[in-house]
């Protein structure tokens, strides 16, 4: 399942440094056919200790963790929605992503001049969010003009409902509230899905701090960002982009040593990946064997048949059933055979809702 987060930010906030850290990740692109690696795209493996345990247990020929794609969205400046900077190019790129990571400068440094002269993370956030809102309003107004006339003429129920939902979105934006804060029904979400509204996408505010502040209490800038994020149910991740860039160039052993020296357990990039995973409601199931141990990303709420289709469409079309054991049972009993002997293995049908950590063998017939 190919999922992408778009990284946005004003000039001199640390976005380029962060993206350097992402693109320095040593990942085998051929293992991820969905990832057409371009200069503005980086792929990061999703940290998962369970995969290391499975690797030890099976000693597979191939070992493929699940991965996440980050896209560097260039051209976001004040006025981007009206064509400033890269304007329309920026808008077309950001509409394609599943989530937005907004890099916010939360450090003081006289050597790095802020585009507006003074460090103010909330002003920066509001500058970017205003551009996203204006872009959404333009789409809404253009569509409303057409569909309203049609609805008045035809009295078509679907058109009338679309007008109602678009008016609701417009009102929210005019009140400085992103569309994601609206309590839309599943039907309403389906109606506006094709528009890929920017302010409907889940968002993470990435607070870029100094190295000396890692592992310490949040500085005043970060506290302001967290307070702002709470109001719109957004997530905040703090990291030092410069440190992440340095970590990305190290071996796993040296990386671990550097993290210990900094007094932190997890890299900021790993925290970012997991936060992105969380806001999109993602989970992982595994396929295991001597030939390959692999992690697969799915959206919570997907059933066994749909999850089989993530591997290959033939698996979904010819789905018969899924042999399922939980990761915890496999670790506790030590082998698939012992799990089966204990009566803990299950045969599940197409409607079974997959759980994070399920280990599956799919039976299918095409």
Where are these regions (language model features)?
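Conserved Switch II/interswitch segment of TRAFAC-class P-loop GTPases
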Residues: 42-47, 74-81, 95-159, 172-185, ...
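Short, flexible surface segments
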Residues: 96, 355-356
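Short capping/connector residues at structural and topological boundaries
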Residues: 6, 34, 39-42, 49-51, ...
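Amphipathic alpha-helical transducer elements in NTP-driven molecular machines
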Residues: 34, 48-51, 64-70, 84-97, ...
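A ubiquitous short alpha-helical element
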Residues: 58, 128-132, 241
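Conserved G1/Walker A P-loop phosphate-binding module
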Residues: 1-111, 147
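Glycine-rich, flexible loop/turn motifs
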Residues: 25-33, 40-42, 50-53, 82, ...
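C-terminal-of-GTPase-core extension/linker across diverse P-loop GTPases
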Residues: 2-8, 13, 19, 146-353, ...
């Amino acid at each position: 399942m190919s999922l992408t987060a778009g990284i946005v930010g004003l000039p001199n906030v640390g976005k380029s440094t962060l993206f350097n850290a992402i693109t320095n990740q040593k990942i085998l692109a051929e293992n991820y056919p969905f990832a057409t690696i371009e200069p503005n795209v980086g792929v990061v493996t999703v940290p998962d200790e369970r995969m290391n345990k499975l690797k030890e247990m099976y000693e597979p020929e191939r070992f493929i963790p699940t991965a996440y794609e980050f896209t560097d969205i260039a051209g976001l400046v004040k006025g981007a929605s009206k064509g400033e900077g890269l304007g329309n190019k920026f808008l077309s790129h950001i509409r394609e992503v599943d989530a937005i990571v907004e890099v916010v400068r939360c450090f003081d440094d006289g050597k790095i001049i802020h585009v507006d002269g003074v460090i103010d993370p909330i002003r920066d956030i509001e500058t970017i969010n205003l551009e996203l809102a204006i872009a959404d309003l333009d789409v809404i107004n253009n569509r409303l003009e057409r569909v309203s006339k049609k609805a008045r003429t035809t009295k078509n129920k679907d058109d009338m409902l679309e007008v109602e939902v678009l008016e609701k979105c417009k009102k929210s934006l005019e009140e400085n509230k992103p569309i994601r804060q609206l309590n839309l029904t599943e039907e309403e979400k389906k109606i506006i899905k094709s528009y890929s509204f920017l302010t409907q996408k889940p968002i993470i505010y990435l607070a870029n701090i100094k190295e000396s502040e890692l592992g310490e209490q949040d500085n005043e800038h970060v506290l302001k960002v967290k307070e702002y994020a709470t109001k719109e149910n957004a997530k905040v991740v703090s990291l030092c982009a410069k440190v992440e860039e340095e970590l990305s160039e190290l071996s796993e052993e040296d990386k671990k040593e550097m993290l210990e020296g900094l007094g932190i357990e997890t890299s900021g990039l790993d925290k970012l990946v997991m936060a992105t995973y969380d806001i999109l409601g993602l989970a992982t199931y595994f396929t295991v064997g001597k030939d390959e141990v692999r992690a697969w990303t799915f959206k919570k709420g997907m059933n066994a048949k749909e999850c089989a289709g993530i591997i290959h469409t033939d698996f979904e079309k010819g789905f018969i059933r899924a042999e399922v054991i939980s990761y915890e049972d496999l670790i506790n009993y030590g082998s698939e055979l012992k799990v089966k002997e204990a009566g803990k293995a299950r045969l599940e049908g197409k409607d079974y809702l997959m759980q994070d950590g399920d280990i599956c063998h799919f039976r299918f017939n095409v």
